[in-house]
């Protein structure tokens, strides 16, 4: 993103710019940040939605799954018309409609040792929205190796962590 905030950008993010701990400098930092979300399901969907609305300048999304009917009630970026389509394709389209100022990089693949190393280098922060321990351990390993910030969340029935 740009280093300058024009009038339209300032208006868009005015509610967070007025916060003492954000301000213009903080908003520029948000606009210039690069975050990747691994998994755009129950956790990743709302995360990518909010990050795009906050103005994160570059968002990566990685998921190899297709949308099913059972996703619709708990994954807010999807609706019935999206069933059978790849999650990353729909997320990219909907996020661009929400905020056309940001860059979206999509990775329609399963995260594995052979491909993740190349992907991770382009981002400052990794957000774990995955639903399996193998991926969680891999994200932890590479976040340490490349000194990346890793944000982890998990859901189990009615518990969130």
What are these regions, as identified by a protein language model?
Residues 1-161:
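Adenine nucleotide-associated cytosolic modules
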